[in-house]
Amino acid sequence: MLYHSIATYFDIMCNLYSLTKGQAAIRDWFRARHDRTGNLPVLPGIFPDQLAPIVRTGADSERELVMARWGMPGPPQHGGAPVTNIRNVSSPHFCGWLAARNRCIVPATSFCEYEDTKPPRKTPIWFALAACRT
């Protein structure tokens, strides 16, 4: 299973990823003590602004599996619209978000980049540890 710290790896995992492992596998892999996701379905396509599971440190200092919306608040000078790729981690706007208390693990089994092919459509290219993307 691939995993990425939100604060560090946004540039790797662009705007589409999948999670085909079940809750038990996620809890075991990341040693999440609490599961607050409810009945989590297989998520073959997770896009920005959608809810998806993350593993974070809870109020009791234990790891917990919870749902979170994908995206970070954007800089006010750019309208505050949510962003999904943080390339300038030295930007004053994002410095506070990089603190350990704001970090989490985003479980993923594969992620997608788009190949720059002829318009009107770009070709999706999936990356995973296994060819079957599971």
How should these model regions be labeled?
Residues M1-T134:
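Short linear sequence motif anchored by a di-proline
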